[in-house]
Swiss-Prot record:
Organism: Gemmula speciosa (Splendid gem-turris)
Domain note: The cysteine framework is IX (C-C-C-C-C-C).
Record protein name field: Turripeptide Gsp9.3
A GO BP entry: cell differentiation
SMART domains, per the entry: KAZAL (SM00280)
Family: Belongs to the conopeptide P-like superfamily.
Organism lineage string: Eukaryota, Metazoa, Spiralia, Lophotrochozoa, Mollusca
GO cellular component: extracellular region
């Protein structure tokens, strides 16, 4: 039982560290300028920076499908 608890603690630590590295990699300062873009996922984003940040944090490939709302 102690071994399982130790493994669980180590696993949680590794996942937390990986998530922290992702946060640092995806850290962006986006402005509040409203220049909507339609993402390849069918969602409207306030601007390209927000789309790029969302794609990075979700680890998905989201590109600008076209300018303007979807």
């Amino acid at each position: 039982m102690k071994v399982y608890c130790l493994l669980l603690v180590l696993l949680v630590g590794l996942v937390s560290q990986a998530h922290g590295q992702l946060d640092k990699k995806c850290q962006m300062v986006c402005t509040f300028d409203y220049r909507p873009v339609c993402g390849s996922d069918g969602r409207t984003y306030p601007n390209k920076c927000t789309l790029t940040s969302t794609a990075c944090m979700s680890q998905r490939s989201i590109t600008v499908f076209h300018d303007g709302e979807c």
